[in-house]
Amino acid sequence: MLEHKPVLLKESLDYLKCKENGIYIDATLGRGGHTEEIIKAINDRGLVIGIDRDHEAIESVKKRLKKYSSLRTVHDNFTNIPFILEQFNIKAVDGMLFDLGVSSPQFDNPERGFSYRKEGPLDMRMDKNQELTAEYIVNNFSHEELTNIFKEYGEERWASRIANFIIKSRQHKPIKTTLQLTTIIKDAIPASARRKGGHPARRTFQALRIATNDELNILKKTINHVVKFLKPGGRICIISFHSLEDRIVKKTFRELARDCVCPPDFPECVCDHKRKLKIITKKPVKPGENEVENNPRARSARLRVAERVLN
């Protein structure tokens, strides 16, 4: 099992510009790597709220970082940040960090169902209290629904063919495990295509994970909802791990950094939209060669940063 290493740690902290007595949100607590460094950058009168959908992550961090009095952990979805802040009676924060994707402990634990290399139940839920699982999707969604998921969330060239093989297979017996699904995907993709582009199941598993957890819809909704809780000058830092996430972050930041979002053919502005953000990173920040060498899972990471402005 790989040790979980926080990605783009120095870059995130540099852009977050943590200050003493500050209030910060780590919206994806994970194993607390970023959180711990934020805590160290503020004094005891500051506050870090760590949020995660995964109860195991929350319990692990509470135990590991129990010596820090400035940490509060919340088992919840980051889309509920407005309600979480209300519970803490906090009106605005100095910064927010989002580290999207699956943590190493989640990915390496076969029982979570994220890995296409290890046998385990076809689960893929970030939050185990959630009802929808990848197993349900694979065994109940129609050919059209599966194809759309694999195309939209996995950018999988063989989406329709994979969906067809899944439906034929589940007619004989339910698809319940990760390696069972991996075998079906391998059979569906032509041999010539399997020899390039990484593991043949990678895109399909990514698509199922995103669909199971509604990751992209939640991401866009959350960015739009939480920026108003940043103090002027406060920053939002988002680390993404694939192009679908990065495009959403880029597009949403751009929309929030514009004064007018009317269609270009409108003769005058009627939207009354006021810019909320200033984009700090014109291009995404990528990990350096040393980080990728020491932590191969950092290779696809992209960091984008924006700053709250006064309307």
UniProtKB/Swiss-Prot annotation:
Protein residues bound to S-adenosyl-L-methionine: 32-34, 52, 78, 99, 106
Reaction catalysed by this enzyme: cytidine(1402) in 16S rRNA + S-adenosyl-L-methionine = N(4)-methylcytidine(1402) in 16S rRNA + S-adenosyl-L-homocysteine + H(+)
InterPro entries: RsmH, SAM-dep_MeTrfase_MraW_recog, SAM-dependent_MTases_sf
One of the record's GO molecular function terms: rRNA (cytosine-N4-)-methyltransferase activity
Major localisation: cytoplasm
Keyword annotations from UniProtKB, A to Z: Cytoplasm, Methyltransferase, rRNA processing, S-adenosyl-L-methionine, Transferase
GO biological process, one term: rRNA base methylation
Entries under Gene3D superfamilies matching the protein: Putative methyltransferase TM0872, insert domain (1.10.150.170), Vaccinia Virus protein VP39 (3.40.50.150)
Subcellular localization(s) per the UniProt record: Cytoplasm
EC number: 2.1.1.199
Transmembrane segment boundaries: none
NCBIfam families: 16S rRNA (cytosine(1402)-N(4))-methyltransferase RsmH
HAMAP family: 16SrRNA_methyltr_H (MF_01007)
Family under the similarity heading: Belongs to the methyltransferase superfamily. RsmH family.
Job description of the protein: Specifically methylates the N4 position of cytidine in position 1402 (C1402) of 16S rRNA.
Protein name: Ribosomal RNA small subunit methyltransferase H
Species of the source: Halothermothrix orenii (strain H 168 / OCM 544 / DSM 9562)
Gene of this entry: rsmH
